[in-house]
């Protein structure tokens, strides 16, 4: 390794969902603003190989990387904050670690030795930490450990990072512990005892946190910080408060004000420039001072859990920022949409978005919403299954193919306008077997897509098995559907549009996965702009 890579490990205590991922992403942004190169990864303690086959209700969105890895939604936060494309090495599960070790044992690679958690599992974990640093040759690798201190599942990861401190030298490792300082309204007090016990548990397995980041709804007084420092064996200046923020992108500035990035640089001996947060400060200012407002209906099947569509939501906000517009999302459960009530449900919106998903639940409601948007000239954006539903709707209601459907959702359909990709027909396993990752797409002239991308060839991330059926291509084109983008060989349809409509675009890929606050995705910029003009 040409650089003396430093390692920051972020753990969490007391309760889950404290924002370890946002803390890690925010630190990455701050270190980049100091001129350092950074990569981030997450270790998840569950035994699934990856989250690709998990229900969104269990895990939220599955975030797909350029190299086709199906990963934790926190990788989306990482990419959006540090503006770097991550890889499969940035998300590792217990399942993947155990699988790799057991596979080696079956091949006889351990020479008949007894395979144990220590050293075999812990060494495999350590290898994956170092792999990220080697892959990018970065100054700092930030690793988030999923789960909560005290969970049995996390112990091998914690033991591995404890060992890394001694493998690479304590001057090259910084431990950050994110914890909760709850406020009891009746007593009018902040309580530090949960933090004390969490750190005690962490220290009992050999890890002394260097910095404690305290989530709280109330400001921590200097006395509270001193108390936490006293019982947790750190200086009060190393206790950082992280108050609830108005929006995610304000968190890096809040943590910088508390001195988090300065402390990390000091502890790791990082010679870095003074921080330049000017661009980020300007972006946060613009987010909080938007001039216009537009309302977008998001019609999906997992709308009860907004994390299932978190990248779509963020991409809409990025598109709004580019248009100086606050995007209000109207969450519509696709199962509730019928031909009888669609006008009532959608009449107050300026645009309709149908995101990706799997399975037939709610599909007819999505198709109704798409019909309404097409017939009422409302800006529409369809993503993945949203594009497939748009093709089905057009085939049924414009081309007149009654019963047209996807062979995935109705194997008996007389008109399978969406069908299984030929290379998928003999695939039996579900995990990691779809068309995944970054693929090129050739755009056609005189289309919405060509206008917003301003490019002939684009690269987008995919996650699907089913595709536009070319047997119906000529019929659909002749009836007015525009094929706006295809694979370079012209075989796979990637983008479709409707003529004589202010904005009707549907794409097979997932544009939301490449949108960044400082570089909003052009499709979302165009869609939000069209919705704003439609008011």
Curated annotation (Swiss-Prot):
Activity regulation statement: Allosterically activated by GTP, when glutamine is the substrate; GTP has no effect on the reaction when ammonia is the substrate. The allosteric effector GTP functions by stabilizing the protein conformation that binds the tetrahedral intermediate(s) formed during glutamine hydrolysis. Inhibited by the product CTP, via allosteric rather than competitive inhibition.
GO biological process per UniProt: 'de novo' CTP biosynthetic process; pyrimidine nucleobase biosynthetic process
Annotated binding of CTP, by residue: 16, 151-153, 191-196, 227
Claim: Ubl conjugation is one of the keywords in the record: no
Binding, L-glutamine: 57, 357, 385-388, 408, 465
Gene3D superfamilies: 3.40.50.880, P-loop containing nucleotide triphosphate hydrolases
Gene Ontology MF: a single term: CTP synthase activity
All copies of domain Glutamine amidotransferase type-1, residue ranges: 295-535
Residue positions of the active site: 384 (nucleophile), 510, 512
UniProt keyword terms in alphabetical order: ATP-binding, Glutamine amidotransferase, Ligase, Magnesium, Metal-binding, Nucleotide-binding, Pyrimidine biosynthesis
Entry binding sites for Mg(2+): 74, 144
Pathway as given in its UniProt record: Pyrimidine metabolism; CTP biosynthesis via de novo pathway; CTP from UDP: step 2/2
Binding site for ATP: 17-22, 74
Region named Amidoligase domain: 1-270
Subunit composition and interactions: Homotetramer.
Extra remark: CTPSs have evolved a hybrid strategy for distinguishing between UTP and CTP. The overlapping regions of the product feedback inhibitory and substrate sites recognize a common feature in both compounds, the triphosphate moiety. To differentiate isosteric substrate and product pyrimidine rings, an additional pocket far from the expected kinase/ligase catalytic site, specifically recognizes the cytosine and ribose portions of the product inhibitor.
Cross-referenced PANTHER family: CTP SYNTHASE, CTP SYNTHASE-RELATED
Function recorded in the entry: Catalyzes the ATP-dependent amination of UTP to CTP with either L-glutamine or ammonia as the source of nitrogen. Regulates intracellular CTP levels through interactions with the four ribonucleotide triphosphates.
Family of this protein: Belongs to the CTP synthase family.
The protein's name: CTP synthase
Gene symbol of the encoding locus: pyrG
């Amino acid at each position: 390794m040409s650089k003396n890579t430093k390692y920051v490990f972020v753990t969490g205590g007391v309760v889950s969902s404290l924002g370890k991922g946002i803390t890690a992403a925010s630190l990455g942004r701050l270190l980049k603003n100091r001129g350092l190169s950074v990569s981030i990864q997450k270790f998840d303690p569950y035994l699934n190989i990856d989250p690709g086959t998990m229900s969104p209700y269990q895990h939220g969105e599955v975030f797909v990387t350029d190299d086709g890895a199906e990963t934790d939604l926190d990788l989306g936060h990482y990419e959006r904050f540090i503006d770097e494309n991550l890889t499969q090495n940035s998300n590792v599960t217990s399942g993947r670690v155990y699988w790799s070790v057991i596979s080696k044992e079956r091949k006889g690679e351990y020479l008949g030795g007894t395979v144990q958690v220590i050293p075999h599992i812990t060494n495999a974990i350590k290898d994956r930490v170092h792999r990220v640093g080697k892959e990018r040759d970065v100054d700092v690798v930030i690793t988030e450990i999923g789960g909560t201190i005290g969970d049995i599942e996390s112990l091998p990861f914690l033991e591995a990072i404890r060992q890394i401190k001694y493998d690479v030298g304590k001057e090259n490792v910084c431990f950050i512990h994110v914890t909760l300082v709850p406020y009891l309204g009746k007593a009018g007090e902040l309580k530090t005892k949960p933090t004390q016990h969490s750190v005690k548990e962490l220290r009992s397995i050999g890890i002394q946190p260097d910095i404690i980041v305290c989530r709280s709804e109330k400001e921590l007084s200097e006395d509270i910080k001193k108390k936490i420092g006293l019982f947790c064996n750190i200086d009060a200046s190393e206790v950082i408060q992280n108050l609830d923020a108005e929006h995610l992108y304000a968190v890096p500035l809040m943590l910088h004000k508390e001195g988090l990035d300065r402390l990390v640089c000091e502890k790791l001996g990082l010679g870095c420039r003074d921080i330049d947060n000017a661009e980020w400060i300007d972006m946060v200012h613009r987010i909080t001072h938007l001039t216009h407002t537009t309302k977008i209906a998001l019609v999906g099947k997992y709308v009860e859990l907004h994390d299932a569509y978190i990248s779509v939501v963020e991409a809409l906000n990025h598109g709004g920022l580019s248009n100086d517009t606050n995007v209000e999302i109207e969450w519509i459960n696709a199962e509730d949409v019928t031909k009888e009530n669609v006008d009532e449900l959608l009449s107050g919106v300026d645009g309709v978005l149908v995101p990706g998903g799997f399975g037939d639940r709610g599909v007819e409601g999505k198709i109704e919403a798409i019909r309404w948007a097409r017939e009422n000239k409302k800006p529409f954006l369809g993503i993945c299954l949203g594009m497939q539903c748009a093709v089905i709707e057009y085939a049924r209601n414009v081309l007149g193919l009654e019963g047209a459907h996807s062979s995935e959702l109705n194997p008996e359909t007389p008109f399978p306008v969406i069908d299984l990709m030929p290379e998928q027909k003999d695939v039996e396993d579900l995990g990691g077997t779809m068309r995944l990752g970054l693929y090129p797409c050739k755009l056609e002239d005189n289309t919405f897509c060509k206008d917003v991308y301003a490019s002939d060839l684009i690269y987008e991330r995919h996650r699907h098995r089913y595709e536009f059926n070319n047997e119906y291509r000529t019929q659909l084109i002749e009836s007015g559907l525009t094929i706006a983008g295809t694979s370079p060989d012209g075989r796979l349809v990637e983008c479709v549009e409707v003529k004589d409509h202010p904005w009707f675009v549907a794409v097979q890929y997932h544009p939301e996965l490449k949108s960044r606050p400082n570089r909003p995705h052009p499709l979302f910029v165009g869609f939000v702009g069209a919705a704003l003009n439609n008011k």
